[in-house]
Amino acid sequence: MKRKLFAAMAVTVFGVLAGGPAHAGFLFGEETKGVTINNNESDLNVRIRLQPRFDFGDLVKDGTSSYESQGDIYLRRIRLELGGHLLTKTIAYNLTLTGDKWDKAGNANAIGIQYAYVKWLADDALVFTVGKEKLPFSRVSLSSSSKQLIVERPVSTEAAKKLFGLTDAYYQPKFSVGGRLAEGLFAYEVAVADGWQNGEAIQSTGARKVLSANPVYVARVELSPPGWVEKGKSDAYLGKGQHLTIGANVASQSGIEYQTVGFEEDRTLTGFDVSGHYNGFTAQFEYNAWEIESTDPAIATKKPKGWYAQAGYFIDGINLEPVARYEVYDHDSEANDKEEKIRTVGLNWYGKGHSFKVGANWVHHEFDTKVKEVTNDDSKDIYQVQAQVYF
């Protein structure tokens, strides 16, 4: 009964929101880009982003046996973004403060630093970055969460982001060199970062902690045909333009030595993706596989892998966008019965482009025996409604 009520509420909300004028443009005007303060060659742009969220469905567990339906209202993301140029237009900087899953059940509220970096834009083909920023792997993860097609990113890519560190592993201090050549037909980035560090708990088996490790090295390349170059990464283009990009990445950290026991492990990740859009239609495919190879017999080798395919179609005038995604995440391909399958369908409405929008998703998980979260249920359903205010 509660699920039917929730579905009816969601349909009603979207019916009201979509009831604006059926013509090109958004109900509340075009997107805003924050406030910019200029001082000669230096400038500062300030932006604020809020993502209120309501979840309902199989959110809590009755001990270890089954799920219980429950609702949860929280702020999925809070962002304060400060960015611009320093002294010259060839030196860019960014400082972004973040609060994730604020007041979500079971979450410890905390303010953190998502980005803190400086870039030297020596040339289109040569950009140097130093500071805290994303490591260059996973197409869907490199796209801003402000421009996601679907409310949450895929389960497998979220797991891959935790491969090279304990805390905020995907957003860690790095030094990188990247750029675009041949008018953007070829793009690249090569990065080095600390990865796993001394004292961090890396394996629950045997309570293994890190003694020392080599740096993590990451490289990504992208190719696009002439006339189909992507100007900036996004999942949702709101019916404008076209792009087609093939991407590949590899990341590796070796010689991660455990404390006291004398064993060590190596970690590698490889990935491949294809993304494209033409006017209102957008689609994306991504595959990632990673390996954790330990000399500790109690840990041995693990090989998770996952892929997803997602698509959406932006309907101009009413500014609605039906979306869907199918994902398979194998928690360890070295073992049997460890697959998780996730199906997502939803609808986005854009009132002011990405500056004000609302998305609603139904997410259905199916679990193999060895990755079930509870003993009595091998599936769960979650309903999500999320708004974004970005100014």
Where on the chain are the PLM-derived regions?
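Outer membrane beta-barrel
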Residues: 26-198, 213-227, 303, 308-332, ...
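C-terminal ends of transmembrane alpha-helices
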Residues: 196-200, 253-254
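Cleavable N-terminal signal peptides
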Residues: 11-12, 22
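Outer-membrane beta-barrel pore domains
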Residues: 26-31, 39, 59, 65-67, ...
